[in-house]
């Protein structure tokens, strides 16, 4: 399969360090975004450890094998981050990172994630979330205790319930689906998705060049104050 892909990352306007990391390997059909946490450069290190681990995955044409290998690689990073936190590398006592990854081959995809970095699919002008946030506000929405439109501005919107490095208990969600020519996948950190709404994202992705769409998204976030690092990967199936 052939793909067109662009990626962008920006420190934002309020942070001194960019703790996000992105991974792009369109030849292998593998992409990821990770959003680190932990203070100073600990979050930057955590997200880089995740993308480095994915970069080192063995090449496989089998999507399920790729997903399994990715989970095992993330499991090892989880162990390593816990040990680093114990050694005093984090001012908060935890070194962690979200991750959202996408693998595509032979007309199918696998998406895997921990945390609130998101994967979207835009198909024929319609946008859908491939991933489900591992967050307190998402749990409240699912329980009918919070309206979806209130989630992004909720006082606990930044509290995630899963992350690589957060706990020895470790669970990665994986979903699968089909892909079609013209499909657009967007992987993004919450620095984008808390600032831009879904209908704005689909408007950017529905036509026009990928580079222009990516640049416009970054510019929109910056124009709205960019309170966090922002990272995105856009992949179009050709």
Protein language model features and the residues they cover:
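PP2C/PPM-type serine/threonine phosphatase catalytic domain
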Residues: 1-238
């Amino acid at each position: 399969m052939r793909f067109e892909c662009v990626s962008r990352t920006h420190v934002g306007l309020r942070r001194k360090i960019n703790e996000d990391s992105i991974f792009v390997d369109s030849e292998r059909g593998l992409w990821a975004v990770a959003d680190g946490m932990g203070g100073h450069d600990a979050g930057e290190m955590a997200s880089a450890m995740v993308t480095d681990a994915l970069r080192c995955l063995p090449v496989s044409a089998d999507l399920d094998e790729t997903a399994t290998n990715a989970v095992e690689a993330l499991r090892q990073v989880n162990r390593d981050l816990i040990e680093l936190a114990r050694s005093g590398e984090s001012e908060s006592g935890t070194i962690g990172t979200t991750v959202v990854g996408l693998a595509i081959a032979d007309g199918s995809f696998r998406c895997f994630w921990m945390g609130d970095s998101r994967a979207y699919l835009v198909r024929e002008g319609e946008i859908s979330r491939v991933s489900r946030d591992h967050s307190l506000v998402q749990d409240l929405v699912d329980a009918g205790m919070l309206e979806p439109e209130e989630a992004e501005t909720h006082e606990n919107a930044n509290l995630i319930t899963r992350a690589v490095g957060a706990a020895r208990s470790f669970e990665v969600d994986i979903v699968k689906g089909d892909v079609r020519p013209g499909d657009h996948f967007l992987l993004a950190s919450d620095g984008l998705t808390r600032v831009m709404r879904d209908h704005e994202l689909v408007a950017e992705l529905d036509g026009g060049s990928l580079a222009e769409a990516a640049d416009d998204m970054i510019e929109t976030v910056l124009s709205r104050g960019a309170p966090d690092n922002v990272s995105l990967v856009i992949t179009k199936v050709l």
